[in-house]
Amino acid sequence: MSIQLGIGGFKPFPVKFVDENKYGDCKALTNYMRNLLKVAGIKSYPALINSGYRSFPADPSFPLDVFDHVILCIPREKDSVWLECTSDHNTAGFLGSFTENKNALLLTENGGVLVPTPRSNYKNNQLSTKTDIILDAEGGAHAVSSIYATGDIDGLFYEVNKEDTDTQKEIYVHYFNYKEPDEFVLKEKEQTGIGTTYHFELSYDKIYDFNAGNKYFLPQRIYQLSNEKINPSYSRRNEYLFRYPYEKTDTTIFHLPEKFSTDNIPSPVELNNDIGYYKKQIVINKEARSLTIITQLNLKKSIISANDYSKIAEFYASVQKNEDQKIVVLSNDRAVAQN
């Protein structure tokens, strides 16, 4: 929603308007919060800003009206607190990729002041997934999964959680790159610290990618940990932008049925440079007939210089090569017809 009023469209509606109508755009809601804080004796300033992770910060050396959004700044002695007043979910002080790492124009009693907004690091955007996959003797499976998400990643799952079940399933498959389930049930969600934990269950008539006789070739997890497609041969002159830095961790536990055993497993690996980190560990418990894969993927920064483009392309190519390895399990009591 955008309600235009005043020169340049930046004059907010009065507090009374928001209070009575229970809605407002970024200007009106920011002004409403500013006045609430004022009553509590807390000083704050509206801040004009240009939004979107692909839009570059306002240039202090070249005056130009590039602003299309308003947020609120609460100045403090050591650091400022920034509020995105249009969000009912963002953690206080977290801006995210929409307005982070920009130059905001504070509207103070002494005039306009251009100040930088904070930049998130990969610890601010976490995705931690744990999945138990119970295989049956026919190659099907039931998966019980929980996701803990913070920052921008939490914002994505929060919006998806508002949709109906069919739409959620479609988004999980086509956007989050989950293997398409035959049944999908989103369970309860719960606020956990600064993030949210989401619980869901999935059922598959066929969890394996393909089979050869009594050998099943399984994916390492029910979704792709990385879907970055970066052309390593491309010559780049400008910076390469990711939406945000992140830390992804995944623990997937395969529970094998009786008379099943592991035939081949992916190799452990660790990759590290100043841009990314990737590590994979495998634990086999023969007594419990389980195979656990623990994986971590960090993107340490979201703005990649042109000089580092080949480095990040090669890093993600190596990650994908490792992610494409299959788990091979063997059915020891019968041969499975080849598909």
Model-identified regions with their sequence ranges:
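A sensor for short, sequence-defined functional sites
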Residues: 1-339
